[in-house]
From Swiss-Prot:
Entry comment describing in which tissues the protein is expressed: Selectively expressed in testis.
Listed name of the protein: Dual specificity phosphatase 21
Principal subcellular localisation of the protein: cytoplasm
Active site: 105
Keywords: Cell projection, Cilium, Cytoplasm, Cytoskeleton, Flagellum, Hydrolase, Membrane, Mitochondrion, Mitochondrion inner membrane, Nucleus, Protein phosphatase
Region (Sufficient for mitochondrial localization): 43-128
Record lineage: Eukaryota, Metazoa, Chordata, Craniata, Vertebrata
Function: Protein phosphatase component of the sperm flagellar doublet microtubules. May act as a regulator of sperm motility by mediating dephosphorylation of sperm doublet microtubule proteins. Can dephosphorylate single and diphosphorylated synthetic MAPK peptides, with preference for the phosphotyrosine and diphosphorylated forms over phosphothreonine.
Reaction(s) catalysed (UniProt annotation): O-phospho-L-tyrosyl-[protein] + H2O = L-tyrosyl-[protein] + phosphate; O-phospho-L-seryl-[protein] + H2O = L-seryl-[protein] + phosphate; O-phospho-L-threonyl-[protein] + H2O = L-threonyl-[protein] + phosphate
Length: 189
């Protein structure tokens, strides 16, 4: 499935939302830790499940919200792969019960984005490239670390027996090929 733009364009254009809450699908949101602990924002967006993808962020437990903890650090050697299927299944289950899920880490940039991409590949039949393009349109600040990219590339191959993103060598080190132009421009500076 290729999608030209986010179905929630206001999320991508409102400056105050770039770092806060971003809606990815009708039932899935990504945010930083501050939003995940903001009862009014959670209530206004009808969040029923919060998935905390961090080892360092403490949950504020609100009534009527289910909490799931994925205690992983944002480091290239951290292992998220074993969480891809169970978390994607959980997000899908919440959606099937007409609930809404908030995925968050500390900044809403790497860990939560990684699990979002895995979910979109599994349940929206998106390639990794399409899932990244879609999510980045909805939340421009996403940038999974290189270790998570390698795990996502492996997961895409497991799901589809092909890859749309690959790791390449650049002047700044090993990067996903979708960042090749950006790395080249950085080198020119």
């Amino acid at each position: 499935m290729t999608t030209a733009s986010c179905i929630f364009p206001s999320q991508a254009t409102q400056q105050d939302n770039i770092y806060g809450l971003s809606q990815i699908t009708a039932s899935l949101f990504i945010s930083n830790s501050a939003v995940a602990n903001d009862k009014l924002t959670l209530s206004n967006n009808h969040i029923t499940t919060i998935i905390n993808v961090s080892a360092e962020v403490v949950n504020t437990f609100f009534e009527d919200i289910q909490y799931v903890q994925v205690p992983v650090s944002d480091a290239p050697n951290s292992y998220l792969y074993d969480f891809f299927d169970p978390i994607a299944d959980h997000i899908h289950g919440v959606e099937m019960r007409n609930g809404r899920t908030l995925l968050h880490c500390a900044a809403g940039v790497s860990r939560s984005a990684t699990l979002c991409l895995a979910y979109l590949m599994k349940y929206h039949n998106m390639t990794l490239l399409d899932a990244h393009t879609w999510t980045k349109t909805c939340r421009p600040i996403i940038r999974p670390n290189n270790g998570f990219w390698e795990q996502l590339i492996h997961y895409e191959f497991k799901l589809f027996s092909r890859n749309t993103v690959r790791m390449i060598y650049s002047p700044i080190g090993l990067i996903p090929n979708i960042y090749e132009k950006e790395a080249y421009l950085m080198e020119l500076m």
